[in-house]
Curated annotation (Swiss-Prot):
Family recorded in the similarity comment: Belongs to the DNA polymerase type-B family.
Gene: POL3
UniProt-annotated location(s): Nucleus
Quaternary structure annotation from Swiss-Prot or TrEMBL: DNA polymerase delta is a heterotrimer of POL3, POL32 and HYS2. Interacts with PCNA.
Cofactor: [4Fe-4S] cluster
Phosphoserine PTM sites in chain numbering: S30, S37
Residues in CysA-type zinc fingers: 1009-1027
NCBIfam families linked: pol2
The protein's name: DNA polymerase delta catalytic subunit
Mutagenesis or variant effect for C1056A: Abolishes iron-sulfur-binding
Result of changing C1074S: In pol3-13; synthetically lethal with mutations of NBP35, DRE2 and TAH18
Length: 1097
């Protein structure tokens, strides 16, 4: 809280004729218009008795009830509605949180166990003698009844393939046995056996003959990598076999190898038949699961995730959030700063309401309707009890917002500092300690991010921040910004420096903090449900076959690898271990037909290829297994077009007559499965099942589209530029062929009213102007043209008419906007692509102005109104009337830069100035301020700019942010000259702050007259002698200005109170993603300045 300044009481006499509308009583009070202070009137002009005066309550709760009854926030009302769910739970009774007990008569010889496995990991199970191996894969899961399971799958040996030596004695079993003995002497008895098998390599077509391979089984899974290295580097010396090194095959992790061979996919159901599994004895159990069993891998039954086995078990999902009490000016550090509250919300997958809502608090806390409060005298006790709560509740999924990089590591480090030794054991394995591992995740699709990984065995972790960063491109990823974007609501955002004040207050202020903390725990659960994060990732794990945990920790390639291994297993095919390395090889991308730029006030029909790249791969049989060369063609006497084709870029692939490729088979299955899922989705009525089916069809679509990218990844598991470049080459020829076919058929010469013109084409679509002004006619022609062009290409390539644009503004390649129509009666939306209005690296003002301009031009057809709005915006920028929140630019912080970047320089400055700053992967908000320094040195934190009265660089925002995007929109309509003319500004005066040195050191600063701005003489008041005669008039105007600002500040204050849901307490919110916050700070600053000016009268 800022220090209050006491101003003297002053009585002022005002003539009736000067202020007929005002009362004659004016008094001056002390004021504190800090961000966290209530809008107490400084100049109280009392027009009537109905004027309300607010009294500041500070941080301590008062007995005075200003509003009659305490108002609850919307969130508290939600909690109140849930209250009946907790009627049967006694306060402080953890037993009510436990899972349903197992039947007392449970007998493994009488009951099958079917469970949905949610996590898998390799481990060692002592005391199990199953085919001389103690290595197991542990599957954690949940039954349909909600019982937790740990299933140890035993007996599976890891293996790799090598080509059998090209030697006469390579098939001699005695020689093979000697080689096994040699390997065991070399690798400490790590080899179990060698089996001779017939396989084909996935790489290249050389005929249909299978070749001999050795399948080498190892005793310990980790020995595969050592053995693989020895084979590939030629370190083995036996009968001259492999002395020059050889390629090894099927390089895949042990856990995934078992899942592939057993037909288990991620998040699928497994059945353990009665009599085939054994219960782990109580004294040998290592987990807290209700059922802990072991089974040989040959005896388990894996169910495909379809039909009756597509449902989801009643998974327990726990969302939590913590609050820490930091020191002044320092971001909380676990070595010094306590955890003061932990809020928890627990729900069942598919349920509408959470069945547990509680807060663990340090010190007392007033009750919260619909929630349980567990108060503790010491932090050690709170942390220990929270850990016990986790064990009792036994969540299957732990979610939150930034829990991976902050909450969980902070709790572990804090418990370590306090020596709470039992705390880091809240996973499902009793003796496995939770530990932090720091890493850097980097991929082309997701960028580079610093992350911390904590092993919580048996419990899935789904950090909604990481999920949203992967799946959505937003300007800001704060919980506030994300909630506003997806849920349409804001939340109070209390700065960490204020949290200590609330904690050190009383039980009421701690209650306010608890409600805040509880909402931060509840929002991730709502976001997960809204975005179907758990459902979509479950279906992605099922479709691609990988464990759920891979989806957040790994990139895209492992998903395709898993599908390839599964299909190869079916058809006796092995995959070579390719040495992944960067390559400079490039291939030509998709064709973009040169756009005919302009504004089209006639319908533009858009023809789209349905799943273009997957369709090309299927139609032309493009695959690793079908790739061949000229020598193979000659050796096998293959006939062109019948046995093989030459792609547009010169690569050879055999046709389906010779062999159907694995990739086309996978794609065909994915697309067919998606059609089935979409059909089931249309027929399904149950909302949760609909969500599951929708998640499945999305996962199938994404998986099909990622296969092409997998082949083109030069740094990857199995790159093949012959495939990826052939796909894009076919795509280019198809786009050009479509253009030619449409323009040749739909022309006046063939009896049509107009000559059709393809105005633009990009990757998988072409935009056609048929010439008609009638929208329905254009849509009918588009449908007809799509059917006609589809006949020119091989199945399953299909061109569809999906939409028309009318009107249509074509600016450049990959940049256009238009009204989007799927039926002629009503447009669907205003669609944009590639414009600054949908980009994240420009300020929101650009998006606001462009959207408004496009709306006026395309929807209202009011070009003059659009131009007037642009001129008005330019004027507002020049006169500093644009709210600073609209000028914020946001960019992601990368680890390294060749040249200084504004946001990176600011991040370092913030760390030096405030002790804490953005991390790699975070988005940094900044504005550009005035001055003559280099641009990267003029990036500044928006709040710092407001608080220190620093002026932004108007010219930068006009020329570097707004000018080019707006000109690109209006120039096609009004011409380049007039469009550029709107941004011609002769001069802009920018206040860059005080200057020192040079001539400035001889200049003395003096006060200026509040009316004429002339210099004041010593001893003169706010007005110079020339303006003194107008003192009364000017004073009344100043009073009006102050009153207007007070009224505005009160409205903003009330708006913030309503958002926080508490109209009787201080506004503590510092949400930097909220326009109201910046407006409140700015008005507060202006009000303080006006009050100080008025005090000089």
């Amino acid at each position: 809280m800022s220090e209050k300044r006491s101003l003297p009481m002053v009585d002022v006499k005002i003539d009736d004729e000067d202020t007929p509308q005002l009362e004659k009583k004016i008094k001056r009070q002390s004021i504190d218009h800090g961000v966290g202070s209530e809008p107490v009137s400084t100049i109280e002009i009392i027009p009537s008795d109905s004027f309300r005066k607010y009294n500041s309550q500070g941080f301590k709760a008062k007995d005075t009830d200003l509003m009659g009854t305490q108002l609850e926030s919307t969130f508290e009302q939600e909690l109140s509605q849930m209250e009946h769910d907790m009627a049967d739970q006694e306060e402080h009774d953890l037993s009510s949180f436990e899972r349903k007990k197992l039947p007392t008569d449970f007998d493994p010889s009488l009951y099958d166990i079917s469970f949905q496995q949610i996590d898998a990991e390799q481990s060692v199970l002592n005391g199990i003698k199953d085919e001389n191996t103690s290595t197991v894969v542990r599957f954690f899961g949940v039954t349909s009844e909600g019982h937790s399971v740990l299933c140890n799958v035993t007996g599976f040996k890891n293996y790799l393939y090598v080509p059998a030596p090209n030697s006469s004695d390579a098939n001699d079993q005695e020689q093979i046995n000697k080689f096994v003995h040699y390997l065991n002497e070399t690798f400490d008895h790590a080899i179990d056996s060698i089996e001779v098998v017939s396989k084909q390599s996935i790489w290249g077509y050389s005929g249909d003959t299978k070749l001999p391979f050795w399948k080498i089984y190892v005793t310990y899974p980790h020995m595969v990598n050592k053995l693989r290295t020895a084979f590939e580097r030629g370190h083995l010396s036996f009968n001259s076999w492999f002395s020059n090194g050889t390629t090894t095959y099927d390089n895949i992790a042990y856990t995934l190898r078992l899942m592939v061979d057993c037909g288990i996919v991620g998040m699928s159901w497994i059945t353990l038949p009665k009599g085939k599994y054994s219960m782990i004895e109580p004294n040998n159990r290592v987990s807290s699961c209700q059922l802990e069993v072991s089974i040989n891998y040959r005896n388990l039954i894996a169910h495909p995730a379809e039909g009756d086995w597509s449902h989801t078990a009643p998974l327990r999902i726990m969302s939590f959030d913590i609050e820490c009490a930091g020191r002044i000016g320092v971001f909380p550090e676990p070595e010094y700063d306590p955890v003061i509250q932990i809020a928890n919300v627990v729900s069942i997958a598919g349920a509408k309401k959470p069945f547990i809502r509680n807060v663990f608090t340090l010190n007392t806390c007033s009750p919260i309707t619909g929630s349980m409060i567990f108060s503790h005298a010491t932090e050690e006790e709170m942390l220990s009890n929270w850990r016990n709560f986790i064990i009792k509740v036994d969540p299957d999924v732990i979610i939150g917002y930034n829990t991976t990089n902050f909450d969980i590591p902070y709790l572990l480090n804090r418990a370590k500092a306090l020596k709470v030794n039992d705390f880091p054991y809240f996973g499902r394995l009793k003796t496995v300690k939770q530990e932090i591992k720091e890493s850097v995740f980097s991929s082309k699709a997701y960028g580079t991010r610093e992350t911390k990984n904590v092993n919580i065995d048996g419990r899935l972790q789904l950090d909604l921040l990481q999920f949203i960063q992967r799946e959505y491109k937003l300007r800001s990823y704060t919980l506030n910004a994300v909630s506003a974007h997806f849920l349409g609501e804001q939340k109070e955002d209390v700065h960490y420096s204020i949290i200590s004040d609330l904690q050190n207050g009383d039980s009421e202020t701690r209650r306010r903090l608890a409600v805040y903390c509880l909402k931060d725990a509840y929002l991730p659960l709502r976001l997960m449900e809204k975005l179907m994060a758990l459902v979509n990732y479950t279906e992605m794990a099922r479709v691609t076959g990988v464990p759920f945990s891979y989806l957040l920790a790994r990139g895209q390639q492992i998903k395709v690898v898993s599908q390839l291994f599964r299909k190869c297993l079916e058809i006796d095919t092995v995959i070579p271990n390719m040495q992944s390395q960067a390559s400079d090889d490039q291939y030509e991308g998709a064709t973009v037909i040169e756009p005919i730029r302009g504004y089209y006030d006639v319908p533009i029909a858009t023809l789209d290829f349905n799943s273009l790249y997957p369709s090309i791969m299927m139609a032309h049989n493009l695959c690793y297994t079908t790739l061949c060369n000229k020598a193979t063609v000659e050796r096998l006497n293959l006939k062109i077009d019948e046995d093989y084709v030459i792609t547009p870029n010169g690569d050879y692939f055999v046709t389906t007559k010779r062999r159907r490729g694995i990739l086309p088979i996978i794609l065909d299955e994915l697309i067919s499965a998606r059609k089935r899922a979409k059909k089931d989705l249309r027929d399904e009525k149950d909302p949760f099942k609909r969500d599951v089916l929708n998640g499945r069809q999305l996962a199938l679509k994404i998986s099909a589209n990622s296969v092409y990218g997998f082949t083109g990844a030069t740094v990857g598991k199995l790159p093949c530029l012959a495939i990826s470049s052939s796909v894009t080459a076919y795509g280019r020829t198809m786009i050009l062929k479509t253009k030619t076919a449409v323009q040749e058929k739909y022309c006046i010469k063939n009896g049509y009213k107009h000559d059709a013109v393809v105005v633009y084409g990009d990757t998988d679509s072409v935009m056609v102007k048929f010439g008609t002004t009638d929208l329905k006619e254009a849509m009918d022609l588009g449908t007809e043209a799509a059917k006609y062009v589809s006949t020119l290409f091989k199945h399953p390539i299909n061109l569809e008419f999906e939409k028309a644009y009318f009107p249509y503004l074509l600016i450049n390649k990959k940049r256009y906007a238009g009204l989007f129509w799927t039926n002629p009666d009503k447009f669907d939306k205003l669609d944009q692509k590639g414009l600054a209005s949908v980009r994240r690296d420009s300020c929101s003002l650009v998006s606001i102005v462009m959207n408004k301009v496009l709306k006026k031009i395309l929807i209202e057809r009011n070009v003059d109104g659009a131009l007037a709005f642009v001129r008005e915006t330019i004027n507002d920028i020049l006169h500093n009337r644009v709210d600073i929140s609209k000028l914020i630019i946001s960019k992601t912080l990368a680890p390294n830069y060749t040249n200084p970047q504004p946001h990176a320089v600011l991040a370092e400055r913030m760390k030096r100035r405030e002790g804490v700053g953005p991390n790699v992967g975070d988005r940094v908000d900044y504005v550009i301020i005035g001055g003559n320094d280099k641009l990267y040195n003029r990036a500044e934190d928006p709040l710092f700019v407001l608080e220190n009265n620093i002026q932004v660089d108007s010219r930068y925002y006009l020329t570097n942010q707004l000018q080019n995007p707006i000109i690109s929109i209006v120039a096609p309509i009004i011409g380049d000259k007039q469009a550029n003319g709107m941004f011609v500004v002769k001069s802009i005066k920018i206040n860059t702050g005080s200057q020192k040195g040079g001539l400035m050191s001889f200049i003395k600063k003096v006060e200026a007259c509040k009316s004429c701005k002339g210099p004041l003489r010593k001893g003169e008041g706010p007005l110079c002698s020339n303006c003194l005669a107008r003192s009364g008039e000017l004073y009344i105007k100043a009073l009006y200005d102050v009153r207007d600002l007070e009224e505005k500040y009160s409205r903003l204050w009330t708006q913030c109170q309503r958002c926080a849901g508490n109209l009787h307490s201080e506004v503590l919110c510092s949400n930097k993603n909220c326009d109201i916050f910046y407006m409140r700070v700015k008005v507060k600053k202006e009000l303080q300045e006006k009050v100080e000016q008025l005090s000089k009268w």
